[in-house]
Amino acid sequence: AAGVDMAMKPDDSGVLESAKMADCEISACAVSAADAIREALDKAQRPVIMLGHGVSDKAVRDQLFTLARQWKIPVITSVLEMSALPWDDPLNFGCIGGAYGHRYANMIANAKSDLLICLGISLCTRQIGTKVHEFAKNAKIIRVDIDKYNLQRNIHESGNNEMKFCADAAEVIRALAENAESAESDGSTVYDFSEWLAVCADIKKSLRAVDDSTPERYPNRMIADLTDALADTSAVAVDVGQH
C-alpha cells in the first residue's frame, strides 16, 4: 500500500463531495473510515459487508470475519473473493453480479440492505449493472479502496448518501478491530444484527443458487450434480463468459 492516501471530504451535511480529495496519512484515513463505519452501524438496521479482492490477505480477512461473526453482519463478495468464506458459512451470502452473481446476493445488497460497507471492491458495472445509480438506492454506501480513480465515479446519483475513503482496506479493518476491542472493554455498544442475518438466511433459502424448477433449467441441475460427484480436491477448468 502507498505511504500516503487521499480521502474524499464530506461537506457540512455529511454528503461526500466527489470532486474533492484531501491528502492525509494512511493511518489517519483508516481511522476516519473506521469511525464513519461505526457511526453508520450505530444507525443501521440491515448492514452488509461487501468484500472484494482488494482484501486478499487471509489474516486481514479473518480479522474482518471475526468482527462480522460478533456483530452478525452478512458478507457478500466479488467473484474473485468467492472462496474467502466456506460455501456453507452462515455469514456467506454469495457474490454480487447482475449477470453472474447469486440471486440472493443481488437481492440482499441491492434491495434489502440499508448500509453497504464496501472494502476493496470496485462496484464496477459487471457487479452492479449498467444502471449504476439504481443500485442500492435506499442504502448508505461507504466505499474503501486504494484506487482513488475508482472512487471518482459515484454510485448514487450526485454522490448522495455515499462516503468514499481512499485508503488501504486492511488498515481500516485493523482500525475497526481496535475500536471494537476498546468498545468491549469500556462497555460501549456491541452490535447484534442477528434478526437481519436471519432475514438474509430466509432470502438465501428462497432464492436458491441452482434453479431447477423447469425442464429449461436442466443445465443448472447438471452442474449441481457434477459438483456433488466431484471430490473436494478436484480441479475444474472453465472458460470465461456466460457459459
Describe the residue ranges of each PLM region.
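Conserved beta-strand elements of the Class I
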Residues: V48, D114-I117, A237
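Short beta-strand elements at the ligand-binding edges of bilobed clamshell
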Residues: A22-A28, W87-Y100, H156-A170
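Short, well-ordered alpha-helix to beta-strand connector turns
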Residues: A44, S113, N138-A139, N160-N161, ...
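Phosphate/pyrophosphate-binding active-site segments
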Residues: A1-G3, L16, D35, E39, ...
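Structural signature of the thiamine diphosphate
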Residues: A1-V15, E39-A40, A105-I142, N179, ...
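Glycine-rich phosphate/diphosphate-binding loops that line cofactor/substrate pockets in enzymes
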Residues: A33-V48, L67, I108-K112, D225-D232
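A general structural motif
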Residues: D23-A36, I96-G101, R217, V240-Q242
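Glycine-rich, anion-gripping cofactor-binding loops and their flanking helix/strand elements
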Residues: H53-I142, I146
